[in-house]
A protein has these predicted regions:
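Gly/Thr-rich phosphate-binding beta-strand-loop-beta motif of the actin/hexokinase/Hsp70
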Residues: 1-13
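Glycine-rich, histidine-containing beta strand-loop boundary motifs that form or position
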Residues: 11, 48-50, 146
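Conserved DEDDh/DEDDy metal-dependent 3′-5′ exonuclease domain
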Residues: 17-133
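Acidic, Mg2+-coordinating catalytic module of metal-dependent nucleases/exonucleases
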Residues: 46, 119-196
Length: 196
């Protein structure tokens, strides 16, 4: 099953990256350079409710990349990159909308991508429709909650499980995007023409 899934993702051109640090600090995996290189050629990020979290975390990561050693140490903040990102992840979740503006990044940093938040484009944010609810409507084959508590320490054995969960959410978002493509295109045209 896992080998088949990897073949399918490869055929789709899917890219997966991760940054991880072991609790004892001896093991580290750093795809930061690959993430930076990815945004040289990929200028559009599509997500679901991505304006409120994913976009912010990506901007924070890319903005701070210049302060990170190859070993993953954020020398300006004097901590490991994973600890830095985790701290801001919690703040972003607790703060809610507008957290990005508290960081002062927008004015001094050229964001290398455009974010398309499908939830916002379809006005599903107004009805608080979650991606899980969308998956049910789409009759998705696998409705899944986060397999590991969001505050848990991540062991190396957990990485594949978390990445599989992320792929499932990405595929739901992609299916939604394809299902309502005409509506998204219409809204995009209206925005372009009337600035709405």
């Amino acid at each position: 099953y896992k080998a088949d899934k990897k073949k399918i993702l490869t055929a789709m051109g899917a890219k997966q990256f991760y940054i991880w640090n072991s609790l004892n600090g001896k093991d580290f995996h750093n795809d930061l350079l690959y993430i930076q290189n990815f945004f040289i050629s990929h200028k559009i990020v599509t997500g679901y409710n991505s304006n409120n979290y994913d976009k912010i975390m990506l901007i924070l990561l890319l903005y701070n990349a210049k302060y990170v050693t190859p070993e993953g140490y954020h020398y300006k903040e004097k901590m490991n990159l994973t600890d830095f990102m985790f701290r801001h992840s919690q703040k972003c979740i607790n703060f809610g909308n507008g957290y990005l503006y508290t960081l002062g990044i927008n004015k001094s940093f050229n964001i290398p991508f455009t974010n398309y938040d499908i939830q916002k484009i379809l006005y599903l944010d107004k009805s608080f429709t979650s991606l899980k609810q969308v998956a049910i409507i789409l009759k998705w084959y696998r409705i899944q909650d986060l397999p590991i508590h969001y505050l848990a320490n991540i062991d190396e054995d957990d990485i594949e499980t978390i990445m599989d969960y992320n792929v499932n959410d990405d595929l739901i978002t992609l299916t939604l995007k394809r299902t309502v493509k005409d509506e998204i295109d219409l809204r995009d045209d209206i925005t372009s023409e009337f600035g709405i």
